[in-house]
């Protein structure tokens, strides 16, 4: 299976770590032997149609800052678009940074992959948040697969749980803590009685929050995941503009104390229950959703099974890379079934 990897940051590098560490296990257990023929980052690309030496490329990236610095296989300034159009591969992995303003370059990368007959695995929430219905229709039109497990819950199989474990049931509502950064901040404020500003600084120091935390604290990151859940699980044709969003930036210690007096906690909850919303809400302390720290939790309310909750870490390079591996194996199984049918 030939793979093009677009984006070689923390997630992309974690994925090549997994490929190297579990090469024999993946081959023995799943018959999966990926051949990465191209990797791109902001400096350019590394290309070898016979398959790149991943350890070599990792060393070049660490030493020079870009895979394009490889003296044999490097190509300075080569763009993802050029690579997707010119290099033959079965799968394109889109792991560039999330852009919720235009969705680029992710949207163009994904569309180009579809139009050249490539299946797509993405961890980039931007294209899905802005154009989910369009992308799924385009994938179907081109008879290729689109997978995105890592966009919701990182390594926690939230999408798979709803799609497979609750298959045959009717999911009526979804409610969840979908952003670990805001959950950590609210936990710190509640348990240690520190201000929002101090909790945010601690989160940044520990690497839980970005230097510019707007996506997290204003609820935008959670909203992108609401869009993905709504489309994929509940077949709602929504995009980011359809979500009512309120972040946690105005939450005070007094607000949290008032909730505590009632035996409740305030959490940033993303919901799809007729409407699509993200907002701080009071929930009972014994509610399964009431998790602390950087944990995510999602409750699915279905017709037959009732309320089912899945909990796990929502972010991290290796966790998200493990979700990419799940998606790659899923595509491999689909292709094998197609050949046998």
Task: Indicate where each model-derived feature is located.
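N-terminal glycine-/serine-/threonine-rich beta1-alpha1-beta2 phosphate-ribose binding loop
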Residues: 1-112
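Rossmann-fold NAD(P)-binding glycine/threonine-rich loop
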Residues: 98-116, 125-153, 159-163
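Conserved anion/nucleotide-ligand pocket segment
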Residues: 164-224, 229
């Amino acid at each position: 299976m030939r793979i093009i990897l677009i984006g070689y940051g923390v997630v992309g590098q974690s994925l090549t770590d997994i490929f190297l560490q579990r090469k024999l296990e993946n081959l023995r257990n799943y018959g999966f032997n990926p051949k990465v023929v191209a990797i791109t980052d902001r400096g350019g690309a590394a290309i070898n149609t016979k398959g790149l030496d991943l350890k070599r490329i990792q060393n070049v990236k660490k030493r020079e800052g870009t895979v394009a610095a490889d003296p044999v296989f490097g190509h300075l300034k080569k763009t993802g678009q050029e690579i997707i159009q010119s290099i033959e591969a079965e799968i394109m992995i889109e792991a560039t940074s999330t852009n919720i303003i235009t969705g680029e370059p992710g949207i163009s990368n994904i569309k180009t992959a579809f139009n050249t007959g490539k299946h797509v695995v993405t961890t980039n929430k931007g294209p899905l948040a802005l154009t989910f219905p369009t992308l799924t229709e385009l994938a179907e039109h081109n008879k290729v697969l689109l997978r995105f497990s890592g966009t919701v819950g990182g390594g926690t199989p939230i999408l798979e749980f709803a799609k497979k474990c609750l298959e045959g049931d009717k999911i009526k509502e979804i409610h969840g803590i979908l952003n670990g950064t805001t959950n950590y901040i609210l936990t710190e404020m509640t348990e240690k009685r520190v201000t929002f500003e101090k909790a945010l600084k601690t989160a940044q120091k520990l690497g839980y929050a970005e230097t510019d935390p707007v996506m997290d604290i204003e609820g935008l990151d959670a909203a992108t995941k609401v869009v993905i859940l709504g489309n994929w699980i509940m077949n709602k044709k929504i995009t980011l503009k359809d979500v009512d969003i309120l972040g946690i930036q105005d939450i005070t210690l007094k607000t949290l104390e008032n909730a505590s007096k009632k035996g409740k906690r305030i959490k940033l909850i993303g919901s799809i229950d007729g409407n699509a919303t993200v907002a701080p809400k009071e929930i009972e302390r014994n509610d399964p959703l009431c998790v602390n720290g950087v944990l995510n939790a999602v409750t699915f309310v279905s017709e037959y099974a009732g309320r089912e909750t899945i909990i796990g870490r929502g972010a991290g390079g290796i966790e998200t890379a493990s979700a990419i591996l799940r998606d790659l194996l899923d595509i491999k199984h689909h292709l094998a079934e197609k050949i046998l049918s």
